[in-house]
Amino acid sequence: MKSTLSYLLIICSLFTACIGHQEESLLFYVDTRTGTAPSATHTAELFGKNTEEYGQTLPAVLEPNGMNFWTPQTQDTEAKCKAPYYYKDTKIQGFRNSHWIVGGCTQDYGSMTLMPVSGTLKYLPQDRGSLFSHQEETATPAYYSVLLKDYSIFAEMTGRSRSAIFRFTYNQPEDAYLIVNPNSDEGKGYIEIDTIKKQIRGYNPVHRIYQGWGEPAGYNGYFIIEYQNEIEEYGTFRHDSLFAGQRQIADGTGIGAYLRFKIHSEGPILIKAASSFTDMEGAQKNLDTEIPHWDFDRTRQELNSIWEQRLSQVTVQTNNRNDKEKFYGALYRASFLPRTFNDVDGRYPSFSTGHPFRQSANGRNYYEDYSMWDTYRALHPLVNILTPKKAGDMMQSLVDKYEQGGWLPIFPCWNSYTAAMIGDHCISALGDAYIKGIRNFDINKACEGMLRNAFRTPATYEEYKNGMGRRALNS
């Protein structure tokens, strides 16, 4: 009897321990702001002052390897080496669906920014920025919130891969505005207001850097923003010029649109947003599929669950909280790239040209933004171990790029050929995936592309200048 009772007590203890372990939130160990301040090392001070001395990371809300990185914005630009957010900055200008190459010194692209304000209408990013305190920020992979002090607005953000939902509590509800910018540094953006559908829609054309610097990448970042409340005023702007009652504006830097909501009491306003690299219909379908409701807390819980599952793939056996924060924070930052590039229906722009639209295989994502010179040594081998199916999809995406563009890419970013670094690191990633037993990609076609890169060079200098072929290979 005693042995039976002891056995039952042991079983109960183990069960309780398992339950306790399962209930531990690993998100608790991740502060997404880590890496947004400058490094204190001597080497960082010598190299990349004001750019690469930073970790160039983001305090983003995202799905692991999702399309959009939903981030607060303190820097109004998509310029090279300028991340959307830095810890040292004192004002928040809005909330962006960023496609920043996290950890690098390249560019953001195809993004838009939205910002709630109240009182006097301030619409330019440099004018409307609000003071905030890091002590009043909550920054996790599934949820971000901050008090915008200048407007007494409590802003909250959560989302999914291609879409987000915002909850803005206007504590001073009179003159409650929403501002939206297509972030086109080249002055090629477009934005429109649809008061019937209660939407703001627009696009931001993507351009290249490195090979083909400044040239169009052949596609746009489309976005849709939806609101519930009635509005009392709307309009557009271009720099210092305000156009009240105008519904659309295009082709210029510093353009955007604004709404003034009809609210007369304190309380939250819900805003939904989504994007696509194919077209406006794709953005709408992404939003309708991922967040078909107006339940902020439901979406937050969905994303919480996704991240708990992601972080729980590795168990850190230590009671040292600092070690857990380092590890799970690093795993978060290892979950940005490559990004999902296709819509929920599988469509995406052709590699290198943008057209025609392609269709990914059923159940398979097409991935983009391989900062391969930085990631082939450690990130991709980690992906191969933790998520082999996803790793195979990433390798198939490289094969797709070879078939669509004619050459296996070296450093594919913004869905274009680039060759900023010498070497041929995609070959290393493909080889490591194969050695680790990953087979859910076209092995023969991958080998064909690898051999072509190794033994042939582009027929023309224009192709080589465009980023095709291996760098410094004798013809």
Place the predicted regions along the sequence by residue.
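Bacterial Sec-dependent N-terminal signal peptides
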Residues: M1-E23
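Accessory carbohydrate-recognition regions in carbohydrate-active enzymes
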Residues: H21-S475
